[in-house]
């Protein structure tokens, strides 16, 4: 990594309301990104502004491969590179700089200045761990003797060779560090200097002939026991890097002092670039611009009342979960329960223990602010674009329900869903499908603070039902072979199952027997770290089937984004989705628009509905998916299409905990949910950990016994997951 990186970028300015060319200089040692109106102005030292990188967070847009943001000092600066490769180079250099100075920030904020004695203590610890590793290495010989086949033996031998190489590297590092310590002691005693590692808070300017040790930080893995990080009083430190110059930009001419590489050690002939006029002594207290014309999202921090500052602790546990293979592993729910028993124990979201599902969790905004340091720790462990599937997440950010239960909220307006089959004309049915689809997302996000639902366990089940308005279930005929066998045939029933853990795939099914309509879907959630945001790609599809008309409407799902993760997180949807009916030829294109940083509204959608073989839509829709959407027809008619503010949410009904099977969502997660409800984060984390450990043990047992996992209610059909006993199949059996 070069200590000075420079090149052109465009920066958004509010004065011009657009992008303006600037020449940027990144000083790795100072932790400072300075910019100038031109390269000539840079050589004359006429700095336009600067961005302080200590404690900064980089963000990217998942739908734009050239722009990125830097959030620091309660401001968000927006930049644009020439292309994706250019952006990647800048982001890599910025991440390395931020990581270095964030680590320094920990030590400075704690008032701890590491001494040679601390360094020596760490060396002793490293040597002790090395001896343990060497002892463990001997176990490979026993493992090799027990190998049953050549393939297994080859894997163990490869692992042994890799471990041997790692041991030798560690030995070499310890020896070099010991030599460096001895040399440092000798030099400092000769000069009468107290033996301490100097904290780097100002711009480091070594002499041209000064030998420098490069300790460029690299990405670190999440610790297996994050709680230990809170207890440790030792803080990492790093030594400054020697002067090396690199220039970003394909059309720029390298300067005479450029080396083109940051990995090789600097030679004694290298000198700091003379044409870079940086502040001679200190890094500015805050990021600034001479005209303060940056575009920044100040209101993001205004909502929370503070800005990101400290990194002091960590909590959480891994989310690698598997299936419970206990005695309750029934293939289907018990269908012998009486209606009176089941319904007397039925509960809506507003009752007792489950009341948390229907209230806005506004009061929990404080918990996000309270645990901001944990989020900062997470940010320091991940890279932009990194898959978050296996990343440890702190317990406090969890929402008190499973992802499977969240999918049930697609049917918070079951009356709109069943009314699809009431339409007599295929055009009206397509319009009604779109209406139900656009109403399906807002109910899942009723709180003002976005949180993450539990990752479902392999084999986890969630089932519920809805009673339609103006309908009564008294003396009603039961749908005994349906997914929820204790409810009436006029209800909408729902069941979901986690059918795969790697990759994480959820399958869910809903139906209304009397209306002869069903819905089958599967979603593979793939999360990605975007800096100030987290993106979740919902890969998969759903199918609405109107059995009376033999019509099947195939639809896709938008992606989700968790924004402002350092302040008050909020959710938005983004991406283009489609709905198609192959039998009738009707189709719809729906676009969920993410909020652009240079203006615009949140939560916008636009949609077009097309007749068969028509390139021009007969209905255009626009508005907000969590607000009001308006429709404009080709006839000139304008009307409110969906008003989610006025649509009553019909509460789902779920059996009480004592009547649920062990593998049902609320039963599985009851201890975690209860402790989150009373805000006992430690107890919630412990409950989550116990659940995970049990599942891991059962997964190992299946592997040792070579037992394949069998799903409960769904099966794989090509690239889709299909419910075993859909209404279509059951009605077909009755006809025959």
Swiss-Prot record:
GO terms for molecular function: lipid binding. It is found in: Late endosome membrane; Golgi apparatus, trans-Golgi network membrane. It catalyses: a 1,2-diacyl-sn-glycero-3-phospho-(1D-myo-inositol 4-phosphate)(out) + a 1,2-diacyl-sn-glycero-3-phospho-L-serine(in) = a 1,2-diacyl-sn-glycero-3-phospho-(1D-myo-inositol 4-phosphate)(in) + a 1,2-diacyl-sn-glycero-3-phospho-L-serine(out). The modification N-acetylalanine is found at residue 2. Keywords: Acetylation, Endosome, Golgi apparatus, Lipid transport, Lipid-binding, Membrane, Phosphoprotein, Transport. Residues 2-99 form the PH domain. Residues 314-329, 336-348 have a biased composition (Polar residues). Its main location: membrane. This is Oxysterol-binding protein-related protein 9. It comes from Mus musculus (Mouse).
